[in-house]
Amino acid sequence: MPTIHSVQRTTPVHQDRYFVDTNVWFWFTYCASKEISTDRSPKRYQLEKYPEFIEKVLDSGAKLYHCPLVYTELANIIEKTEFDIYCENNPAATINRKEFRSLESEREKVMSEINLAWRTINDLSTCLDINLREDRVPSIHELLSTTTLDSYDALYLGLMQQEGIEKIITDDNDFVSSTVADIYTANNRIL
């Protein structure tokens, strides 16, 4: 059972090493500069508490980590959010996400947002190599079978274990079912 820590009450130290879950990066890099009013808008605490904690971690000299899979998950979330914003601003539009990708100006905006977010993540944290070989599947499958993690989070946890990283910054209560040592969160459902 992981130890749960409040990001508001934690003081990071130089030796700390944190893996940052994708949604935290999303709120830190993309949402921080936008007012999003879709059905899936971030909550105020997500936009305030996680960026504040990331800044505290960086100020302490502690290390932040991500992996290349964060890019695919983040790109999908940003595209979905931009699509939702487009649909809300254009209620007469009856397009799906694939058709949305064909709108040149919207595609450029999405790609610009993804590029900016990814550059920021790489500027602030270390990208861990991920080996997605067939021999890794059984351990990931075991994590999926014994926790409530989704496949991305199971891969992240497997990578953290491989790299000896025991701390994760996340809003996701599924990590409570995992073997990660320490969860850092602002989510009151977990605390």
Model regions: which residues?
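Acidic, PIN/NYN-like endoribonuclease modules and their adjacent C-terminal/linker elements
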Residues: 1-17, 157-191
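Short, well-structured N-terminal submotif of metal-dependent ribonuclease cores
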Residues: 1-70, 77-93
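Active-site neighborhoods of divalent-metal-dependent phosphate/nucleic-acid chemistry enzymes
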Residues: 2-3, 13, 111-167
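Acidic active-site catalytic centers that drive phospho-/nucleotidyl reactions
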Residues: 21-23, 153, 172
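Short, solvent-exposed loop/turn segments at secondary-structure junctions
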Residues: 24-26, 70-73, 174-176, 190
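Low-complexity, serine/threonine/proline-enriched polar segments
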Residues: 56, 69, 81-88, 99-133
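A short acidic, often aromatic-flanked loop/helix-cap motif at beta-alpha or helix-coil junctions
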Residues: 72, 133-139, 189-191
